[in-house]
């Protein structure tokens, strides 16, 4: 594993961990992929996008064709905040300070599509990479934790909205539905993503396996050692490469108190306290760790993916193929959007009435 210092200026060096095609099948395609381990510039979306571009440029300089960012990189993951609810959630209004905190968080989120999405698409096109970006999406007054996909031609492909926020995330994020569980068939392979603890949902994983996912992206906020076991299991279960990207951040990467206060930790952490140590990792379909996990700092974690490894792994175990028993166990996925309000146009109502001769008056 080669350790390549970052050439970007400002701040501590970013380290790229690169597995240089060791043991790859020369008869199969190889994809160089990078997972980004870096912190949001909290409450400052333009600065976060500037940082993202520097990191994408650097990864592209190493020859990376696919770049995966952490959960909520654009918009931020609100570590330590309870948005005014305190330790105990109760019926009623949170404190005014919590409401103001949510207003700021809402302002830092992005609309999809929107100008920030246009800029991210331009980055993907400029540096000729497939880009998988974790964002906080704003739709009206509701926020969603989402992943956006872009291709090297500078096109926005689509998104995945987190189906099930975890714990206090449910206070601030809405719930996705089955209409945004995409797997994109790209020249690099079939690429999709689930976010953080969604990856613990067996049926949701199976939906991706059913779509033939080959490069499984797992943006996360979970830095615990046990997360590595989950990532290894998914690689083995799905016969796919798993790319998990998490932020590395210190207290000083968030606004200082009293603007932003870390709750539930007993006392306010010092500026240099690590509040998320990362753990980003790349794992092969055979369960081999190709790069990472890194717990040391901001990093570009890069490996060459030998796509021939997928076929070799599927020979042992194909969860939606020769190892499936659909006459006993099967999965039905509702992939229709679920909207709280739907309108039928007057023209549609008229057409429907004319086509139904048995329609009753109302």
Swiss-Prot record:
PANTHER family: CN HYDROLASE DOMAIN-CONTAINING PROTEIN, NITRILASE. Its EC number is 3.5.5.1, 3.5.5.4. It catalyses: a nitrile + 2 H2O = a carboxylate + NH4(+); 3-cyano-L-alanine + 2 H2O = L-aspartate + NH4(+). This is Bifunctional nitrilase/nitrile hydratase NIT4. Belongs to the carbon-nitrogen hydrolase superfamily. Nitrilase family. Residues 31-307 form the CN hydrolase domain. Keywords: Hydrolase. It comes from the Eukaryota. The active site is at residues 71, 162, 196. InterPro entries: C-N_Hydrolase, C-N_Hydrolase_sf, Nitrilase/CN_hydratase_CS, Nitrilases_CHs. Pfam families: CN_hydrolase. The keyword Hydrolase applies. Highly specific for beta-cyano-L-alanine (Ala(CN)). Low activity with 3-phenylpropionitrile (PPN). Not associated with auxin production but may be involved in cyanide detoxification. PROSITE patterns: CN_HYDROLASE (PS50263), NITRIL_CHT_1 (PS00920), NITRIL_CHT_2 (PS00921). One of its GO terms (molecular function) is cyanoalanine nitrilase activity. GO terms for biological process: detoxification of nitrogen compound.
């Amino acid at each position: 594993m080669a350790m390549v210092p970052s050439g970007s200026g400002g701040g501590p060096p970013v380290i790229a961990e690169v597995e240089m095609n060791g043991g790859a099948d020369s008869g199969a395609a190889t994809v160089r992929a990078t997972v980004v381990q870096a912190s949001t510039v909290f409450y400052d979306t333009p600065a976060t996008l500037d940082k993202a571009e520097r990191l994408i440029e650097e990864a592209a300089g190493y020859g990376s064709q696919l770049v995966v960012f952490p959960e909520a990189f654009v918009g931020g993951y609100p570590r330590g905040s309870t948005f005014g609810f305190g330790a105990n959630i109760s019926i009623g209004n949170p404190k005014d300070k919590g409401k103001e905190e949510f207003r700021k968080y809402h302002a830092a989120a992005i609309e999809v599509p929107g100008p920030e999405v246009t800029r991210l698409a331009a980055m993907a096109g400029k540096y000729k990479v497939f880009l998988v970006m974790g964002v906080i999406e704003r739709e009206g007054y509701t926020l969603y934790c989402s992943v956006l996909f872009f291709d090297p031609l500078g096109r926005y492909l689509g998104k995945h909205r987190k189906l099930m926020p975890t714990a206090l995330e449910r206070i601030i994020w809405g719930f996705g539905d089955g209409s945004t569980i995409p797997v994109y068939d790209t020249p690099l392979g079939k690429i999709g993503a689930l976010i953080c603890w969604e990856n613990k949902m067996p049926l949701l994983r199976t939906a991706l396996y059913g779509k033939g996912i080959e490069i499984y992206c797992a943006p996360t906020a979970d830095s615990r050692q046990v997360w590595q076991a989950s990532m290894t299991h998914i690689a083995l279960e799905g016969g796919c490469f798993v790319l998990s990207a998490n932020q590395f951040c210190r207290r000083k990467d968030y606004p200082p108190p009293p603007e932003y206060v870390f709750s539930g930790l007993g006392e306010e952490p010092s500026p240099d306290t690590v509040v998320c140590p990362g753990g980003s990792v790349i794992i092969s379909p055979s369960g081999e760790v190709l790069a990472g996990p890194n717990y040391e700092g901001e990093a570009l974690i890069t490996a060459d993916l030998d796509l021939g490894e997928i076929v070799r792994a599927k020979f042992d175990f194909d969860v939606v193929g020769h190892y499936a028993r659909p006459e006993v166990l099967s999965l039905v996925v509702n992939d229709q959007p679920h909207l709280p309000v739907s309108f039928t146009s007057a023209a549609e109502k008229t057409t429907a009435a004319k086509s139904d001769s048995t329609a009753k008056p109302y």
